[in-house]
């Protein structure tokens, strides 16, 4: 499905849209009480209130089914791999990269030189490095564009780490718990709402950074985990019932933009 989250790293756990129901009309089933889960319904469970503005279009959740013809584990694994290569070919893009915790620009250049010497394909500035993609100042953009150009001259990709969830921003921008009316209750405890002023600005800053520097890889730690938000003042969603859907759409649009931009 294209509506999956919760940080499980496994599609069968992260799938939020697959619901197996019973079918009382299926009277020939083995289960005496007709409770065999055999009727598949696909829908997002926590997105019941999506209002469309004039000229706005709605694109529903999409789920792909793969029919298995064997219990053989290896064959099933090959079938799943082929499905991903066909439906989501970008999942095959796995460059050999070095994770770097840099403290200055020279360490980045040294890592790029090491990658050239050892056959690595990319450098990713990791958590704790001196990279800040949310800094849109001219000085920061110029610095990282210079380093990106250096990497590209040596045919090395350059990327960086960015944390979205599991961080507290402010009462005005964090996810609001429906039970308390206050920030909190998110998947990671506290988390920003992607539909808040901060969340929308974060999206725009990431786009600006990549467009201005030529960076190649975005390592997004704690992407949107499906948090619902009860705020009625965030510009990116109306209220609780559309908050999950709208935040998911914001993240997907950002990922699509990055992929389309190379």
Model-derived regions: residue spans:
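Short, well-ordered coil/turn segments that N-cap beta-strands
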Residues: 92-96, 119-121, 152-158, 214-216, ...
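An acidic-aromatic substrate-binding cleft motif
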Residues: 59, 73-122, 126-129
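Aromatic-lined carbohydrate-recognition surfaces of secreted/lumenal glycan-active proteins
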Residues: 158-169, 247-262
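Conserved, mostly hydrophobic/aromatic
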Residues: 55, 115, 151, 221
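N-terminal accessory beta-strand-rich subdomains and adjacent acidic, glycine-rich linkers
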Residues: 1-81
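The substrate-binding groove and active-site-proximal loops of carbohydrate-active enzymes
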Residues: 94-105, 126-142, 184-203, 215, ...
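Active-site-adjacent "subsite" loops/lids of carbohydrate-active enzymes
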Residues: 88, 142-149, 153-213
């Amino acid at each position: 499905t294209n509506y999956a989250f919760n940080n499980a790293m496994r599609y069968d756990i992260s799938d939020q849209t697959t619901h197996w129901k019973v079918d009382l009309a299926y009277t020939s089933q083995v289960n005496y009480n007709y409770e065999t889960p055999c009727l598949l319904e696909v829908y997002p469970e926590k997105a019941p209130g999506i209002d469309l503005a004039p000229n706005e279009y709605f694109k529903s959740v999409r789920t792909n089914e793969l029919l298995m013809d064997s219990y053989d584990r290896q064959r099933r694994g090959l079938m799943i791999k082929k499905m991903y290569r066909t439906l989501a070919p970008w999942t095959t893009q796995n460059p050999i990269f070095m994770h770097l915790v840099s403290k200055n620009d020279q360490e980045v250049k040294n890592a790029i030189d090491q990658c050239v010497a050892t056959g690595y394909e990319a450098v990713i500035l990791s958590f704790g490095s001196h990279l800040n993609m949310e800094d849109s100042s001219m000085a920061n953009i110029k610095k990282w564009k210079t380093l990106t150009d250096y990497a590209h001259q040596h045919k090395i990709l350059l990327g960086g780490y960015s944390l979205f969830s599991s961080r507290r921003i402010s009462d005005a921008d964090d996810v609001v718990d429906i039970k308390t009316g206050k920030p909190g209750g998110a998947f990671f405890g506290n988390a920003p709402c992607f539909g808040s002023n901060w969340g929308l600005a974060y999206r725009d800053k990431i786009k600006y950074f990549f467009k201005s520097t030529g960076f190649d890889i975005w390592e997004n730690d704690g992407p949107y985990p499906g948090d619902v938000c009860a705020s009625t003042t965030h510009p990116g969603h109306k209220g609780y019932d559309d908050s999950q859907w709208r935040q998911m759409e914001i993240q997907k649009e950002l990922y699509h933009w990055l992929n389309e931009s190379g």
